[in-house]
């Protein structure tokens, strides 16, 4: 199954996350199909950038959103 979830980037204690489309059987930081945005919780205010067009496409072909991505994209 295809999922849209976060993959961790950055360095120790300074993480940021890419919002990626991947197979659900892959590891968290394993290979991904497409990167559709990023999320940086370490700055004030939090920086969220998502390609809405690509997000809508992947949802239309059956990709599931992780809980965190669903809450981020609803903001």
Curated annotation (Swiss-Prot):
It comes from the Bacteria. Keywords: Ribonucleoprotein, Ribosomal protein. InterPro entries: Ribosomal_bS16, Ribosomal_bS16_CS, Ribosomal_bS16_dom_sf. The keyword Ribonucleoprotein applies. One of its GO terms (cellular component) is small ribosomal subunit. Belongs to the bacterial ribosomal protein bS16 family. Signal peptide: none annotated. GO terms for biological process: translation. HAMAP family: Ribosomal_bS16 (MF_00385). The keyword Ribonucleoprotein applies. Pfam families: Ribosomal_S16. Gene3D superfamilies: 3.30.1320.10. GO terms for molecular function: structural constituent of ribosome. This is Small ribosomal subunit protein bS16.
